[in-house]
Structure formats: structure tokens, C-alpha cells
Swiss-Prot record:
Protein name as annotated: Phosphatidylinositol-3-phosphate phosphatase MTMR1
GO-annotated molecular function: phosphatidylinositol-3,5-bisphosphate 3-phosphatase activity; phosphatidylinositol-3-phosphate phosphatase activity; protein homodimerization activity
Disulfide-bond pairs as recorded: none
Residues at the catalytic site: 438 (phosphocysteine intermediate)
Chain positions recorded as a 1,2-diacyl-sn-glycero-3-phospho-(1D-myo-inositol-3-phosphate) binding sites: 351, 376-377, 439-444, 484
All residue ranges annotated as the GRAM domain in the record: 90-161
Catalytic activity: a 1,2-diacyl-sn-glycero-3-phospho-(1D-myo-inositol-3-phosphate) + H2O = a 1,2-diacyl-sn-glycero-3-phospho-(1D-myo-inositol) + phosphate; 1,2-dioctanoyl-sn-glycero-3-phospho-(1-D-myo-inositol-3-phosphate) + H2O = 1,2-dioctanoyl-sn-glycero-3-phospho-(1D-myo-inositol) + phosphate; a 1,2-diacyl-sn-glycero-3-phospho-(1D-myo-inositol-3,5-bisphosphate) + H2O = a 1,2-diacyl-sn-glycero-3-phospho-(1D-myo-inositol-5-phosphate) + phosphate
Amino acid sequence: MDRPAAAAAAGCEGGGGPNPGPAGGRRPPRAAGGATAGSRQPSVETLDSPTGSHVEWCKQLIAATISSQISGSVTSENVSRDYKALRDGNKLAQMEEAPLFPGESIKAIVKDVMYICPFMGAVSGTLTVTDFKLYFKNVERDPHFILDVPLGVISRVEKIGAQSHGDNSCGIEIVCKDMRNLRLAYKQEEQSKLGIFENLNKHAFPLSNGQALFAFSYKEKFPINGWKVYDPVSEYKRQGLPNESWKISKINSNYEFCDTYPAIIVVPTSVKDDDLSKVAAFRAKGRVPVLSWIHPESQATITRCSQPLVGPNDKRCKEDEKYLQTIMDANAQSHKLIIFDARQNSVADTNKTKGGGYESESAYPNAELVFLEIHNIHVMRESLRKLKEIVYPSIDEARWLSNVDGTHWLEYIRMLLAGAVRIADKIESGKTSVVVHCSDGWDRTAQLTSLAMLMLDSYYRTIKGFETLVEKEWISFGHRFALRVGHGNDNHADADRSPIFLQFVDCVWQMTRQFPSAFEFNELFLITILDHLYSCLFGTFLCNCEQQRFKEDVYTKTISLWSYINSQLDEFSNPFFVNYENHVLYPVASLSHLELWVNYYVRWNPRMRPQMPIHQNLKELLAVRAELQKRVEGLQREVATRAVSSSSERGSSPSHSATSVHTSV
């Protein structure tokens, strides 16, 4: 199938970078905008940052507007009629219109808009706003310059105006969630006629404007149904469950037991529903300890939950204490239970004064409590903000390392990996069951359990296994994607936003760097997942929990991201992958072994892109490997045929065993 071109990685900054997913209609590969396109405009690399002064930028907007000699635009009344005529006449190139997805519609077209690129200078072209994307194109350059941005990645839109030389000009600054910002300039009269700013706000933030996300309008057809990738019963069966110690429970089948948990959970066999309800009353949000993963040999388990509601008076719950004892007893290899609290000890103490808390060793005598000292969502959000400041639009080469260090981003990645390694080591080497929680059990808990499971279980390092891991530990167990990402919401300052899932994927990428042959998927796979975390093209990351997804008909009215990915696995496959089953990975969680993911965080800067087309080279290697495998299979068949023929000719003569060809590619 033809691969849809990517909006999430297109344009001046990204046109020559990775192409991680669909964000426009099916179309031939497009030329990238970059330093080689057309005549170079005056550089604007010294533009203020999005948080800096707007005065200098307004001056540049005026100059850009005057120099562009803006001549006109397409009125909103003519958009649909003109588009139909051009489509029927196959004249899309004439009007520089955007290719559309099935279900996507054009909302506004404005000609002679100026895109102020921080790397190439000002570029004049046609701006198209649809209900899914912002599409800017200049056909005068060779190759054509294209900026293709899903509206879902937009965090906020700011309008700026100025007057000079009697010529009104407008500017729009678009702050994105994927480490870039965009600046556009056009005549004031065009804004008045077409409402560019209003159109962008309306369709970039549909939920704030009483509309549905575009994923509910997207009508692409794929040969594979990605919603069938994860089946909880099948996944637990793969792990050997149920068994004598653990049962698959449907106590939450109607989401009344815990509204943020999945319908199907695994709990100790001996625990009665009444006792389970009492445990739920003692755990924040009713998120009781439930099984995530079980070791196939030792039966040591990873269970996840939320904090106990101990409070300042050290409240106890005998059912909860007995419940954790039952979890420990289910593993005959150890007489101890390790409780990993992801939080900082001081923060957990503060939570205790507010009614939360942690398990005391006096109430849980066979448990050992370990604080992993990982910071909260607000600290992580601020760290990413600092990182964006140093990677876009310009990079201070002289202070690069110290600037990266100052964001603490890699330090927080290190802490997550170190915590997950400790969990995996207790399970694998210590044969000890562990309980993992933070405050509510849907942020740091998901990071730690999924990373530990990735280290312990080679299945999760395959493409479909990783999809299962994300569906299970993140989506079904209630990571609040809608709140953490802010899908379709214009409240960019919402304190609930945080790059929790991004950190997890970054940790996975760090592991692929340390174990390049241990993962079936490649870097493009991870970037594609992150791009569509924001794009709102697919339904995979919408809503906050499983119950909400059913209420919103996400599974029936939207398409899964895995439908797209699994329909073209070669694009996302690692040619160096070797499937070592039962092989545990222990990544080195040291800053000396970690690096900033430049191909993701700095991909919009054309000067930071790798000189070699890595993705194309990987595809070629996959083709070579497939050809070599065919040749090996052919040789094996030839050897087998000769052996049979030789045996027949000798008849009753003593048999000679043929030597098999054993070749690994």
C-alpha cells in the first residue's frame, strides 16, 4: 500500500527528516523544504524565542509582509466550489491545495502568506487550513517547500499585529507540542475576510469549541484492524494465567469497582470480592494491587496499584495487609515483598498529611519499602520546557552540553531506567515479587512497570508485543492521555499536562541504543508513536481510561494507530533484530551511557539531521536480509533433495546422513 506522507515531520524544519506517519491524503513522496530550495531569503535565525519580546518580531512581520507584495486570497465562499472544480479537473498543483485524507475537509485557503522559517528566512506561499492540518506550500522553489502540521500538535495560537508605512500586517505564532514553533505573516485584510486565527483556534482545539476530534471523522481503510492487537485474556494466557494462585476477575466488568481500571484484572485466587472492595476503599481512586506480569519460572510477580490512604493518623486496613501478604505467598521462592514507591520520600510524607501515604513496615512486616525518588509531573513538564528552549530554533554549540545538563531531562530519564532495572533485578535475580505505585498509579507507575516488563520479557520487544505493552500498561490501566497531552483543549497552561509517555518512549529509545539487536522495531516506529500521540488522527491515545473510550465509542468510530503500523511492518522493522527468548536486558542507567535523542528533539533543525539516510539504509538492509534468507532456504532444499536422490540411487547400500546447512542471517 502507498504510505501516506507525514505531516508530523514535514516543512522547513522537518521536510528532510523522518517521515513518521500519515498526516495528509495518500500521495506520492514530496520534496522536502530546506536550505537547498530556491533562492535564500535573509536569515532570521536571530528571531526571539516564543517567550521573548514580540516587538522585534512585529518589525520583521512588517518587513516580510511588504517584501512579499501580498496580492490577494481565496474567499471562504469560493473554497468548496473552487476545490471541487480543481479536483475534477486534476489541477490541484495550480492552486497549491493540500491533499486530503478521507473525511478531511478544507476550512480556509489564503494565498501569499509568509512563513518565517528560522533556518531559511521568509518563504511566501499558500496556507490551507483543514479540520485536521495546517498546510503551507511554496511551488516556486525547487524542490517545492511544504509545511504540513497536524492541528493536534498545536499547544497554543497567538495573534500579533502591527502597522508600518500605512500597510497593516498580522502575525500568528503557533506553539507546538512536538518541540517546534511556527510563525506566519499576512495582510490584516485577509484576516478580516477569512478569520485565519479563528479557524486555527476552532479546529486546533475542537473540544474547547464543542466539536469532536478529527479521529472521529478519519475514514481511511487499512487491511488490518489494530483494535484487535490486544486482548487481555489472551495476553494473560500467554503469561500462564490463570493458575492456582492468580485468577482473572471480572469484578470490574461494568467499571463500578474502579472506573479507571480495565474491565478485566488479575488478582489472587483466594481473595473474595467483599475483601477486594475493602482494599479498594483503602487505596487512592480504588486502584487495588493487580498483577501486571508473572515470571514463567519463579512465579515472582509485578503488581501495580495506587498509594494507601494511611493519612496523618496512620490508618490501617487489615484486608489490605492480608492482601499484600497473599501476593507474597503466591511466590514460594521468597518470603519477602518489595514495595517500590516511585515518589520522593519527602513528597510521600506530604501526601500522608493530606490523607495519602505509604506502607509502614510495622503494618506490613514482610514488606520492604523502597522510595525511588522520581519527581512529579510538574517537574517533568518544566524540564521539557527547558529542553525545548535550548533545541529550538537555534542551538548554542559552545554551551550545548551544559545547557542539556541544565534541563535535567537526561537525569530524569536515568532515574526512570534505574528504577526499572531495580524492579527487573528483584524479579529475575532475587526471585522476589514486587508492588509498584506512586500516588494514583497511572503515571510513574506505568513508566516503571512497562519498562521493567520490557527488560524481562522478550515478547514486548517485538512490534506487536510492544503494542500490547502500551495497550495494557498505559491505555487500559488508565494513564490520563487526554489530560497529560491536552487533546483538542486550548488550556495550554493546564497543570495536568506532562510528558510522562514521552519519557517512557525516550527510555525505550535509550535501551535500543544499548541493545541494537534486541528490538524488532526501529527508531521510526517510536517517533511515529509519539507523533500520533498528539496528532488526533487515530483513536489509540484518546481519552483517559477504558471506560471513557467505550462511552465515546472510540473502538468503533475511530481507527487504531496499530492498523496503520501493522499494515506496513517493513517500514518499522529493525534489520538487526535477533529474537533471543528469555533474555533479560539490564541497561546501564548512567549518564555516561545516555544521550539526548537528537533525531526526535532536534529533528526540525535541518543542520542537525544525519548526513546518511538512515531509514532508507535500514529498508535496504531488510531487503538484502530477505534475499539472503531465500537463498539459504533454497540451498537447504537443494541439499535435502540431493540427499534423498543419493539415498535412492544407492538402494540397499549403507546410508549416509546428509549434513544440514545451518546459516543464520
